[in-house]
Amino acid sequence: MKGTIIKGIGGFYYIKIDNSEEIIECKARGKFRHTELTPMIGDYVEISIDKNNKGAIEKIYERRSELFRPAVANVTQALVVFSFKNPDINIDLLNKFLLLCEYNNLKVIVCFNKMDLVNKEDYKDIISMIEQAGYDIIFLNAKEERNMDIIKKLIKDNVTVFCGPSGVGKSTMLNKIIGKETMITGNISEKLKRGKHTTRHSELIYVDEGLLVDTPGFSSLDINFMEKEDLLYCIPEFRDFIGECKFTGCLHHREPNCAVKKAVEEGHIHKNRYDFYIKTLEEIMNRRKKKW
């Protein structure tokens, strides 16, 4: 049998079987202890059931993506949620979330919540910056369910994580989407008599033919793992200019005849995005110097 790990507690994994609402409790085979591969929420797996009706994970299929905070495999898209007011938008923070999503190869949709508090025209430069970078934007008022129908359609056939700073309404959005009646995993603890009083872990929730990670993504915004070569490919609007600079391996920093810098001057790349890139690049380079 094959299915998806939707929850893991204390060495037990709960697998939702394909084309069924059946959830089977499994342990991982001992062979996984001798490899670097540990089962994760979101893993697509093959399982077996023994004569005592005990489940075991036999195989973990190749992951399309892998997040670490929260630890979830095979996420396909991120809804990056911000507000312009309450709390006020922090452009660098928004860019950092976008950077982490790109690093993890996630499709990104930017959601601006609490639109009832602001006039969109006052923020047209920020909106233009995001659109210029190639991201779709959805304007929301989650409390009043404005445009939440669009979000629900996006979730279908995807594994979706919500991310963004505190206070922007991620939990409200999740609650509006999930609703108690759709929570297939909601009664696992009761049914299996395990997990009720354990530390809370991420889990996947099936809703509208899609999967939601039930805890906000990127609880850490640390980018210490990133190298300058990674950074180059995490700013999507730079990609059109790769190979057009004078120097191979151009970092678009102090090098002359740089196609990216020219694109910034001509308005094809937003200056805020370029400034964020330079600031992040210098952080990475300074960290590397300290290492040595």
Curated annotation (Swiss-Prot):
GO cellular component entries: cytoplasm
GO BP, sorted A to Z: ribosomal small subunit biogenesis
Residues that bind Zn(2+): C245, C250, H252, C258
Swiss-Prot/TrEMBL keywords: Cytoplasm, GTP-binding, Hydrolase, Metal-binding, Nucleotide-binding, Ribosome biogenesis, RNA-binding, rRNA-binding, Zinc
Cofactor comment: Binds 1 zinc ion per subunit.
Its EC number(s): 3.6.1.-
Protein task: One of several proteins that assist in the late maturation steps of the functional core of the 30S ribosomal subunit. Helps release RbfA from mature subunits. May play a role in the assembly of ribosomal proteins into the subunit. Circularly permuted GTPase that catalyzes slow GTP hydrolysis, GTPase activity is stimulated by the 30S ribosomal subunit.
Name under which the protein is recorded: Small ribosomal subunit biogenesis GTPase RsgA
Species assigned in the record: Clostridium botulinum (strain 657 / Type Ba4)
Taxonomic placement: Bacteria, Bacillati, Bacillota, Clostridia, Eubacteriales
Gene it is expressed from: rsgA
